[in-house]
C-alpha cells in the first residue's frame, strides 16, 4: 500500500493509505505568526463539509505535541464534536475525548517507541523525543513513523536534533523535517541512518508572508538544503 499526502498548511499533513486516513497536527483555526492556520476552505470541509469529504471523520488524529502552532484546542474540540474519529495519539491530552474518539496519550523516553497496527498492513510507530530548544526541553514530542510493506514515512515534529533518538524508524522512503532541523548538524547523520529517497521540509511560513521571521525560516531552509545531496530535498 502506498500513501497519498496532502498539506494542511504549516505542519499539518493528511495521510491516506488503503482507505485509512490520519491527520497530523492539522486542525488549527487560531493564527500563530508567522505560520498559517488551516486554510479556511479546508477547515470548512473539516467542520461542515459533506460526509464524503476526505477531511471529514478521519480515522486517527495525531499530534506531535500541543504547542499552538500544532494544536488548537477549540478547533480540535469542534472537529471531534462533528466527526467520527477512532483514536487520538499525542504525548499528552488536555481534555476528555469526545464522541467516538479514544484519547491515547502517553509520554515516551527519548528514543523510546510504541507500535500500533492501526489497520491491516499499516503500522504507526510513535517515537519519543524532547522538543528542540533549551527553553522547550521539558516538552515531550512524538515523532511518527507510518509504515506499510511498500513505503515508510517519518515525521519528526519539533523533535530535538539528536539522530540516535530516531533510530527506531529504521530506513525510510520519506523524511519530514522543519527548517531548523534541516539546517542542524544532525541532518547529515539523519540522512545516513535513515537513507530517505526524499526529504520534505514542512512547518514553513506562508509563501506570501515576507516579514522578518518568515524570511528567516526560508533562509534557514535554503541553507540546510544546500548541505545535502542535490535533489534530495
Briefly describe each language-model feature range:
Residues 74, 130-193:
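Active-site-proximal loop/helix segments of hydrolase catalytic cores
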Residues 4-7, 22-25, 123-129, 152-158, ...:
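Active-site-proximal beta-strand elements of phosphoester/diester hydrolases
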Residues 49-115:
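Active-site HxH/HxHxD metal-binding segment of metal-dependent hydrolases
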Residues 17-62, 74-78, 160-170:
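Pre-active-site segment of Zn-dependent metallo-hydrolases
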Residues 23-25, 57-69, 89-92, 154-158, ...:
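Active-site neighborhood of phospho(di)ester-bond hydrolases with catalytic His/Asp-centered motifs
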Residues 11, 29-31, 66-71, 93-98, ...:
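Active-site environment of divalent metal-dependent phosphoester hydrolases
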Residues 15-18, 118, 146-149:
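Active-site beta-strand termini and strand-to-loop segments that position acidic
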Residues 100-122, 166, 188-233:
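Binuclear metal-ion centers of metallo-dependent hydrolases, dominated by the metallo-beta-lactamase
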Amino acid at each position: 500500500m502506498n500513501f497519498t499526502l496532502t498539506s494542511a498548511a504549516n505542519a499539518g499533513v493528511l495521510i491516506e493509505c488503503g482507505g485509512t486516513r490520519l491527520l497530523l497536527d492539522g486542525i488549527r483555526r487560531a493564527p500563530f505568526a508567522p505560520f498559517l492556520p488551516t486554510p479556511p476552505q479546508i477547515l470548512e470541509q473539516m467542520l461542515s463539509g459533506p460526509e464524503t469529504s476526505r477531511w471529514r471523520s478521519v480515522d486517527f488524529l495525531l499530534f506531535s505535541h500541543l504547542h499552538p502552532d500544532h494544536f488548537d484546542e477549540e478547533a480540535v474540540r469542534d472537529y471531534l464534536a462533528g466527526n467520527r474519529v477512532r483514536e487520538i495519539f499525542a504525548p499528552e491530552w488536555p481534555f476528555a475525548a469526545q464522541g467516538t474518539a479514544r484519547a491515547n496519550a502517553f509520554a515516551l523516553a527519548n528514543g523510546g517507541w510504541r507500535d500500533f497496527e492501526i489497520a491491516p498492513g499499516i503500522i504507526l510507530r510513535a517515537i519519543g523525543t524532547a522538543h528542540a530548544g533549551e527553553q522547550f526541553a521539558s516538552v515531550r514530542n512524538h515523532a511518527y513513523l507510518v509504515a506499510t510493506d511498500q513505503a515508510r514515512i517519518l515525521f519528526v515534529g519539533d523533535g530535538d536534533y539528536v539522530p540516535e533518538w530516531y533510530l527506531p524508524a529504521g530506513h525510510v522512503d520519506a523524511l519530514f523535517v522543519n527548517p531548523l532541523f534541516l539546517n542542524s548538524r544532525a541532518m547529515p547523520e539523519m540522512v545516513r541512518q535513515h537513507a530517505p529517497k526524499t526529504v520534505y521540509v514542512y512547518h514553513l511560513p506562508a509563501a506570501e508572508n515576507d516579514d522578518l521571521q518568515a524570511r528567516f525560516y526560508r533562509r534557514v531552509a535554503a541553507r540546510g538544503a544546500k548541505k545535502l545531496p542535490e535533489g534530495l530535498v
